[in-house]
Amino acid sequence: MRDLIAVQRNSYYTFLTKSLKEEFDKISPIVDYTGQLELHLITSKMELKPPKITPVQAKRQDITYSVGMYMPVQLWNHQTGDVRQQMIYFGEIPLMTEDATFIINGAERVVVNQIVRSPGVYFQALWDKQHVRTFEATFMANRGAWIKYELDKQKLLWVRLDKNRKMPLVIFLQALGLNLQEIKPHLTNREVFERSWENHAVNNTEAALVEFYKKMRPGEPATVHSAKQLLYARFFDPKKYDLSEVGRYKLNQKLHLDIPLSVHILTTSDLLAGLDYLIQLCLDRARVDDIDHLANRRLKCVGELLQNQVRIGLSRLEKLLREKMTIGEKLQPSSLLNPKPLTSAIREFFASSQLSQFMDQINPLAELTHKRRISALGAGGLTRERAGFAVRDIHPSHYGRICPIETPEGPNAGLIGSLAIFARVNRYGFIETPYYPVKKGQVQKSIVYLTADVEDNYRLAPADVKYDREGQICSPIVAVRYRQEWTTCDASHVDYMAISPIQFISAATCLIPFLEHDDANRALMGSNMQRQAVPLIRASKPYVSTGQEKWMVQGVFSKADGIVRSVQATSIRIQHARGPVDYALLKYQKSNQDTCIDYRPLVWVGEHVVKGQLIAQSAAMDSGELALGQNVLIAYMPWEGYNFEDAFVISERLVYEDVYTSIHIEKYETDARQTKLGAEQITRQIPNVGEHALRQLDEHGIISVGSWVEAGSILVGKITPKGESDQPPEGKLLRAIFGEKNQHVKDSSLRMPNGSRGRVIHVRILSRDQGDELPAGVNISVRVSVAVKRVIQVGDKMAGRHGNKGIVARILPRCDMPYLPDGTPVDVILNPLGVPSRMNVGQLFEALLGLAAHRLRKRIKIVPFDEMYHKEASRIFVHQQLKRAALSAQTILYDGRSGEKFDNAVTVGMAYMLKLVHLVDEKIHARSTGPYSLVTQQPLGGRAQHGGQRLGEMEVWALEAYGAAYTLQELLTLKSDDMEGRTATLNAIVKAQPIPRGGTPESFKVLMRELQALGLDVTVLQLESQALCVMQSKLD
């Protein structure tokens, strides 16, 4: 089975086994300021203690799933010759689960791969305002200063270090101790360099060093010693300058050097070879670099990102240790070492980095895609505002590496992508894609992985080239890709051939059948919307698929060969050679997006299973294949205008037969806190609540599992002590008259919110008395999970796999839906106008082939890009299948209401439609009264804040255009932020009096105050042009 998340797993494994020790080795030994004490970290004996809990328990307890790191540490005292050794705890490192996720504080997170410029050397040609060409070479390090060579229009050489002022390159080379005789042998053309030498050279190295220092630190006294120190610190100190193994590999490759990969600093050979290449470039003997080519961009996967964080943490730890290391009698390694700087750096990364993301868990495809995502954003990457078109654009080198289709719409377009289906990442972080080698026109059986720079040197044939059983290419002339251009060549000159027509697209995109007949924009929407499909109660496989669904599996796999001994809803027991193993199945667990994670067994008692076999599948799967939607009978026709603008008309069958019903799990939580007036209590004794409302609570006041709850139902009964000031006036009166004490508690129970109903499936009680970890001031925490069944309704969003999305506008009774000549009513009516302008004709092929498959009682798998077989292969194949099923592409339909024929034949088909996570239940919102913003006194915005509908600029313009002056004034004052007017209006409505006129809006007062704060005297003038301080009095 193809491992689609190997990128994540391999990277993290390298981090734990190799990179972690490397970082500790870099700081060991730590020597104090006197040189008397040395702290040695013995990384060879580092131990990682496995976690005591499982990932499921970590989620349940809201803790981090991590490994403890221990290492022996020796403290050497050179004064006494004493060596003390102790095993030291270095903190916790989050451990990746089997599914390549991390559990941080109970939440499942994913670390996204970052695509960055590779360290190395880059050559560019620039055009100035006079259209004269100049050249530059940039040495980019993984960590440390950049060096930029510049060759101007006078053919003089300059160098710029980081963003400092430029200086003559000759001075820089002389400061490094090089003279003309040492430089000349490294250059193939010496005239350009000699001109610069004559113009800029100084007498000796010392003078060059002083000149260098003056340029780098103008205004500071320049000495040879300080210049040497600066030069060393900038480019030759491994702690401050690091090319990394990748940078060294790229430099060697570009400049044809053979310096060992362990050398991570710049050498004079690098600098002189770079200079020689720049001069060759100026003479048109070399090529400039394309910075968007994937040879020059690499992936930083989870392991490398974590390694960088560990480096930051260890540098902080090293600084802290140096300050603590003072000679003392009882000094022990344990008293010196505090792992906090290291653990806080790692925690900081997982909690706040742009690349550590809350996992998209709507369905198995969304999870998989999230783990294979590539982002150009994040620390050390690009920002949305700075990224231009070139970075976002599709590049020829993306073929087989990064999907050209799957990317978000909007500001992140092109900055966030997805790995192609067969792509893998090599040890340097460069993406490779597989090819079949071709020798003398014969395709070999073996597979070779090539990086983007290697690929450019070969002639590559596409996957749809025909070849016979022996592998011999049939056509004498073949279209090939060579140096990123398409050309033709003799079959015997082909070097490699792509392995599949779908190798250039991502996991989500390769699930779209007839992809080649869709416009790219719609294919993009189709890819993205499949990730938003909600798992349904009854999953069913598509009639028309691409055959890739079996790779997108999610579930439980057998760890070894064996025989199934028992199968239950919650576990499967398999007898392996080493003994029985119980596999726990997740039942009705809440995902990050509130969808339901529910595993169903796929095996029966007595079945022989093999290692790696799927024994239980998740909710959005059917027979071990991904099943995100349902096959429904669709018709492309207008229906009374209800499917105007992409809306759908659907049949009641989809509601009553639970075709598009999904289960969502909502979590409600309440805490019993310690307040100043006493502790809150969780109890059944709630003041002023009848017995009927308490009927489902147990003796402790907590809802029973299995109870059906509606809006307003009490989930957890809770009372809070209240003070004297909280007493209502009638309470105070009673006390004043009778001296009685009425109840000193108020009802603060957890209730079901408006618009929600469902069944309680889990109740979890966390108590400080039972040793559970709770925040300060919390004694008891109760969590209630409610499963909500959501049937499809008007306002829900549906979509096909081709970007054909829409909202359900009307649900018709079955008897009113148009029906086929055999009496079968249609399930969904789509607008035919949604096809031509959108150019996603793939949906028609899918619908018609699906209808034929349904009639023939079979499922059809068709790989995209089937034109390799012959011209118009898709159309011919669909017609063949329709003919075999004795069906026509268009059918006479009858109106369900009148029984009459429709005037024209209608395209009817069986399409695979998805219900998306944008459910109307979570969007519908209304406000009568609610919270207001403190400063402007305008209603808050958004459903979460119970906000109002904003009347924006354009709406104001529309009302102005209609001259609706009174309506406009009401909207800007009484209904918004005129505080006095609001209260007066409420009283007027209650007392059935005329609505008062609007006063001054609060936001206008804020504007006045801001202008006054600037020292401007603002007054309001009446038409009689006499100044009235009306505004002033109101403000006062």
Curated annotation (Swiss-Prot):
Q: Name one GO biological process term.
A: DNA-templated transcription
The reactions it catalyses are: RNA(n) + a ribonucleoside 5'-triphosphate = RNA(n+1) + diphosphate
Q: Does the keyword Metal-binding apply?
A: no
The record's section on CDD domains has:
RNA_pol_B_RPB2
Q: Does the keyword Transferase apply?
A: yes
The protein's UniProt keywords, in alphabetical order, are: Chloroplast, DNA-directed RNA polymerase, Nucleotidyltransferase, Plastid, Transcription, Transferase
Q: What is its EC number?
A: 2.7.7.6
Its localization reads: Plastid, Chloroplast
One Gene Ontology cellular component term attached to this UniProt record is: mitochondrion
Per the record, the similarity remark reads:
Belongs to the RNA polymerase beta chain family.
PANTHER family assigned: DNA-DIRECTED RNA POLYMERASE I SUBUNIT 2
Q: What does this protein do?
A: DNA-dependent RNA polymerase catalyzes the transcription of DNA into RNA using the four ribonucleoside triphosphates as substrates.
What name does UniProt use for this protein? Answer: DNA-directed RNA polymerase subunit beta
Q: Which organism is it from?
A: Cyanidioschyzon merolae (strain NIES-3377 / 10D) (Unicellular red alga)
Lineage of source species: Eukaryota, Rhodophyta, Bangiophyceae, Cyanidiales, Cyanidiaceae
